[in-house]
């Protein structure tokens, strides 16, 4: 199956000395510690991956439809290599040649396709040496991005926490075998730059469906399906309020020891960032001023609750929650607002509104 093709994909990458980027919200499809791994492209992903793929002459897209959230400009960088030749393989014929024009495509199993491709390449050049110059380029790209991200994430010791500092702390404390489910929203997207996995099927996300409130219910299912793996659900306070908070009682009643991490910034971050950038900070429905203490609420339901508002508390709280073997909620108090929110999902999607009736003139963006 496509999910079991890691050995073949790794063999192909190593034979070609080809850098590997993860598609959007699939941070678990290639080992992050591999010399050729560059991280995820797409919204709030890895600049190393984006800077690398934009130099490509050929892109081999395996088991991905190359959706728009994974190929549109990010960090003010247009990185998708429009002039590169594209080879695409997927079992679903409907995604082939859909979002990006493929020069060659194959409707087939990625594992079988990749194995046969490597076999044919080895017959043509059995002793192909590794490209040391390319390995050095990949290493430099990753080191540069790591330094940028560290500077971005380590600048604040404040309480409440800068969200990027918070994301760095909790992702560093993740157990190696952890399964992480992520929701949609500004904070949930920001962690795409931080989540790293060495195994497959460790990152479960809402993908392009955008179904807010996804992560906690998905985590319950993951824990039932993989009871020996630590399972962490990450949500913002808006998404958690949709479904997560109510389902803590389910986790307690059914003894499903999932850890929920709630980034509480008292706002719908994605919507607020659009209103900051496109509506001159005229806010409608963007604020959540009356959130309860989700840690205390979890304890009232019979779960363990942790409230953290300083970076030094985060790692210990997550480690204690995982070790407890009980349903847990970590209520993380983070900063919100225009100084810390990530860029909008789509800078090209909104234009300033035009009002044609005088009675609505007072609503015009300034």
Please name every model-derived segment.
Residues 6-9, 140-228, 277:
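Active-site diphosphate/adenylate-binding microenvironment
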Residues 17-24, 87-90, 258-263:
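Short internal beta-strands
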Residues 22-38, 132:
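Short connector loops at secondary-structure junctions
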Residues 38-40, 44-45, 98-104, 201-205, ...:
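Short beta-alpha connecting loops at secondary-structure transitions
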Residues 42, 46-68, 189-268:
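Thiamine diphosphate
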Residues 42-96, 288-292:
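Phosphate/diphosphate-binding loops
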Residues 55-56, 95, 103-104, 113, ...:
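Conserved thiamine diphosphate
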Residues 83-184, 311, 320, 326-366:
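Phosphate/pyrophosphate-binding active-site segments
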